[in-house]
Structure formats: C-alpha cells, structure tokens
C-alpha cells in the first residue's frame, strides 16, 4: 500500500508545532498542552480564578485549562469539564466525555453542575477544521453561542466568562451580545497564541443576570 503523503500545509503545521517554544516548554514542565500558557496569561491580567470557586471548562481535552484551574481554585473549589474527546483523569476535575452540542450531554453536564450557580465558564472549544473558512467559521460561531447559552443557565451574577473566538463573520455581533450581558469585556491575544491564527479570547466579567 502506498503511504499517503502529507499536504504541504500539514507538514508546515507539524514543523511549526514541534519548533514551538510553548510546546517545548509544556513538555518540559509536564503540562497537558501549550494552551495552559494562554489561560495563565489571561489569569495574570484578569484574575478570573480564585480559591474556592466553581468553574466549568468546555472543550477541556487534553486538560491544560482544567489542570490550571484546579490549581487555582484549590481543594475547596470545583472544576467540571466536558469534551467530545477523552481526557486522562485530573485530580479534582469532574470530567464528562460527550458532544456538548447534544441535549443529552448538556443535561448530564447540568446535572454535574447541580443547583448552585458557578463562578466562571471557560471555553476553549473549536470545531474540526475542514479547511473551508466559511464553513469553519460557522461551526466555530455555533459552539461559542452554545457556550454563551451555558452562561445564561449556570453563571452566577457578577460571574466571569472566557471564550476562544475566531475573528470573522459573526464576531462583531457576538461581541456586542456579550457586552449586553457583562459589565466589562476585553479582547486578549495571548503571546502563546500563534501570530497567524485568527483566534482571540473574549474575557467578560460582571455577569448581569
């Protein structure tokens, strides 16, 4: 059988990935992924996570953000995580594997959260990329709309929301939607986010509902 050759774009991505200083640093420190440096930088600027908080982490696998969050909230806090992909266990993290887009999975996640409101909703969700920007953008926007809907269901008054968003069609409308629901909204582009990536993080605090 002839081995399928990698496309130039995938070969370039692999080289960029393994040459990435943050990938190397994450491996050296035994961290789940380079994504932990993004939430670490956001935490340094915005102080979203504190001891004793309850946090929901959407799109959690392989666990970088959950790993960071559980260290921040400590033994008296809670981290409830969800992803369609499997994730190796992390002490102190209640992980649910399932497709967040499905009602049954959402129901199971809400059961894990319980009756009390949460302090922070985090979303690093991203769709499987097709390579067609219009399709990928629509899929990404759908996921972040679901994340915002999660805030409406579980986030306490004055709670916080941090979400990965890809700049493109629908971005401005989504940003305006968040500004109506939160007292303060900032856009962050962490140093560890690849420069050519369209991703930014919306950091919203002071939930009004």
From Swiss-Prot:
S-adenosyl-L-methionine binds at residues 63, 65, 83, 99, 124. It comes from the Bacteria. Pfam families: FtsJ. Its main location: cytoplasm. Keywords: Cytoplasm, Methyltransferase, rRNA processing, S-adenosyl-L-methionine, Transferase. GO terms for molecular function: rRNA (uridine-2'-O-)-methyltransferase activity. The keyword Cell inner membrane does not apply. The active site is at residue 164. Its EC number is 2.1.1.166. InterPro entries: RNA_methyltr_RlmE, RNA_MeTrfase_FtsJ_dom, rRNA-MeTfrase_E, rRNA_MeTrfase_gammaproteobac, SAM-dependent_MTases_sf. Belongs to the class I-like SAM-binding methyltransferase superfamily. RNA methyltransferase RlmE family. This is Ribosomal RNA large subunit methyltransferase E. It comes from Aeromonas salmonicida (strain A449). The gene is rlmE.
